[in-house]
Amino acid sequence: MRRWPVVLRLMLLAGGSGAAPAQVTIDNFERGLDPEWKVKSFRGATVYRVVAEAGGHVLQAESRGTASGLVRKIDLDPRDYPMLSWRWKVAGTIAQGDERTRAGDDYAARIYVIFPHWFFPKTRTLNYIWANHLPQGTFLPNAYTANAMMIAVESGPTLAGQWLTERRDMVADYRQAFGEDPPRLGAIAVMTDTDNTGAMATAWYDDLLLTR
């Protein structure tokens, strides 16, 4: 992202109330784009739309030098349902991207997990990214703020064009990232952004789910 407020402003959208259900289907996009998803724009508008694929529906994101995301509020204790799973696919990664610099903080696909705090500077996020060059499995503080931890779930263009299913233990990842147990989960976000590099990127997301 271009400026530090981009990551932090996404954190501001976290919140909500309600008891944790037995299973939380964040979205499978079979009924289109749920209005619970809220657009958060930073520089231009990444185009998000639900498209048909393989007999079902998925969320497609297209960025052309833009940065905007979709944010959905969720209020639950991640220790009750720590597993986040999803499917995603990218057309390619961003050759000019560099996860270690502000100028290169662009990603073909990423999923934010937002843990809000009443004192905003203590709000933290896990950013599950399809990295451009960062080795798979790397944990790296975001170039703008150490309160956003980048986690390279996939890396590079080798598997571009293929649907991959991911499953992450948010509690374990939070402990590794920040050295303590997580607070309540406040929101989930998806973002495809290329505002720093001016590149083009297309990604697809589907079957976002929280389980035990």
What are these regions (language model features)?
Residues 49-69:
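Short carbohydrate-recognition loop motifs
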Residues 87-93, 116, 171:
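Solvent-exposed strand-to-loop "edge" motifs in beta-rich extracellular domains
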Residues 106-111, 146-156, 160-200:
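Extracellular beta-strand ligand-recognition surfaces/modules
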Residues 104-148:
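Extracellular/luminal beta-rich ligand-recognition
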Residues 29, 188, 207-210:
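Extracellular beta-strand elements of beta-rich domains used
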Residues 21-41:
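Extracellular carbohydrate-recognition regions
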Residues 8-17:
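Bacterial N-terminal signal peptides
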Residues 73-84, 157-160:
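Extracellular/lumenal carbohydrate-interaction signature centered on repeated Trp-anchored short motifs
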